[in-house]
Amino acid sequence: MKFKSLSLVVPAYKQEKTIVTDIKNLNKTLSTLPYKYEVIVVVDGFLDKTYQKLQDLIPKIKELKVYGYEKNHGKGYAVKYGMLKAQGDVIGFIDAGMDLDPSEISVALDLMDWNNADIIIGSKLHPESKVNYPLWRKILSWGYRTLTHILFGFNVKDTQVGMKFFRKKVAHDVFSRIVIKRYAFDIEVLTVAYQLGYHKIYESPIKLNFKQGSITSLSFWEIVMSMLWDTIAVFYRLRIVHYYDR
């Protein structure tokens, strides 16, 4: 699959301290790639000065588009919002905060091209990945990976990395059906993709440097329980009421 343009969505929540540096670094990386591109930042709630700082950055980065809304809805909502506005031949998203090194985007796009893939997902378990994150995160990732394999039978090793790329039609077909707004939306994305027949999903190496102290108003265990509940809800919609067949 030859493609000429890329849209990259960046969901941002209370990132006023780092967002300008993050977007400048991301733009520097994308400017080296042989594609036309746009960077779509979705500010998930006007809770600090993130939106204002991005507005000030627009005159300096012509490829930057900024959207936002008053109330915080969750990462899944923000990603969906941006993905459905994107128009690139390939549409992807990457987490703000730059725990993930954007230099690996080029590798993901090469894999998309070489494999004529529907979806490329970053994976901590790819043999060429370089990851730095604590043992307790590894244990939780293993447990959640085992659960999702039992429930959904995904033929991928890691579903949760915040860097994924889709062919335009795949992105619009999948994200128009997404319901989950917060923590388990990655699982719902892959579930919907499989259900729609998009099975050409490949994993790509990443460089991950986990930064302690992610900004959220919820406790760690509240997040874990919310993810489990949302994951069960996806299973219910898939297997019981066949919501995604519509």
Feature map (PLM): residue ranges:
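Hydrophobic helical membrane-anchoring modules
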Residues: M1-S5, K17, N25, G153, ...
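Hydrophobic targeting segments
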Residues: K4-V10, I19, L26, Y37-V42
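A short, exposed helix-loop element centered on a Lys and neighboring polar residues
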Residues: Y13
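Acidic helix N-cap motif at the loop->helix transition within catalytic regions
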Residues: K17-T21, D48-L57
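Short beta-strand/loop segment that forms part of the nucleotide-sugar
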Residues: Y35-F46, Y67-Y69
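A conserved acidic beta->alpha catalytic loop
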Residues: V43-Q52, M98
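Acceptor/aglycone-binding surface of glycosyltransferases and processive sugar-polymer synthases
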Residues: Y67-K85, V90, P102-Y183, F210-L228
